[in-house]
Amino acid sequence: MQIRRRSPNPPVEVDTLRYQVKVPDGEPRHILEEIVWHKEKEVDRLRESLPLLELRKQVQHLPPPQDFLGAITQGKTQPALIAEVKKASPSKGVIREDFDPVAIAQAYVKGGASCLSVLTDAKFFQGSFENLALVRQSVDLPLLCKEFILYPYQIYLARTKGADAVLLIAAILSDRDLSYFLKIIQTLGMTALIEVHSLTELDRVLAIEGVSLIGINNRNLETFEVDLKTTSQLLAARRDKIQALGIKIISESGLHTPDDLQFVQQAGSDGVLIGESLVKQPDPTQAIANLFG
């Protein structure tokens, strides 16, 4: 998947790296490219109101992050559950009208989730970094910031809002960015969940030093179609290398039934990331019990 980047702004310098993105012509070709183009402008606006230097100062005064990877390894369920606090998505629209991020997060904790994921994208998922901060204040589990990370700025912002881990999507990042962002995340004591959807993306990520956690997204982010066999096919193709490197695997998207969980666990997944099928239920705690029964 080749994502064109769009940014009308001048170069941005972070430490010794200089970021400048060519502006493509035309309209976005699919929803993922539309999200990326919008995110570039969104981050520019955030930088104007809260500079990166200020974020980095704030991070220095925070307590150490929790061990997200360790929580997966010692999962309270099998496979370990990353339960997602999610109001909406481009494919489903609003999933839960009476959305209360704190109440949902607390229900997940009660249900036995090992970690939580909080959507922070506003335009396409109706999330926010404020939701991440609210959840951080209300629960003790490790938190993943589920965001379309394009710049180091977003990593520091996620940390200031209480994230212990951040999502990096291979489809929207170059190899250089993946490697550099991973180093920033590790320097901050956080965990990177690096998401792939294809064998090409998986091979790119496996070639990067220091990767410990990979998410296999069963959803094609160009079409938003879901196929659970994505997890089994990628793991079957690279199982030996993944095991040799000691990398943990999370299966993401399209998980709705106990049979789905059994399928991806037998394929080799150490954990699952589930949002929609839990959020839409009146009682998310009971929904977890029904899935993991």
Swiss-Prot record:
Its EC number is 4.1.1.48. GO terms for biological process: L-tryptophan biosynthetic process. It catalyses: 1-(2-carboxyphenylamino)-1-deoxy-D-ribulose 5-phosphate + H(+) = (1S,2R)-1-C-(indol-3-yl)glycerol 3-phosphate + CO2 + H2O. Pathway: Amino-acid biosynthesis; L-tryptophan biosynthesis; L-tryptophan from chorismate: step 4/5. It is an enzyme of class 4 (lyase). One of its GO terms (molecular function) is indole-3-glycerol-phosphate synthase activity. InterPro entries: Aldolase_TIM, Indole-3-glycerol_P_synth, Indole-3-glycerol_P_synth_dom, Indole-3-GlycerolPSynthase_CS, RibuloseP-bd_barrel. It comes from the Bacteria. Keywords: Amino-acid biosynthesis, Aromatic amino acid biosynthesis, Decarboxylase, Lyase, Tryptophan biosynthesis. The keyword Membrane does not apply. Pfam families: IGPS. SUPFAM superfamilies: Ribulose-phoshate binding barrel. NCBIfam families: PRK00278.1-4, PRK00278.2-4. Belongs to the TrpC family. This is Indole-3-glycerol phosphate synthase. The lineage of its organism: Bacteria, Bacillati, Cyanobacteriota, Cyanophyceae, Oscillatoriophycideae. The gene is trpC.
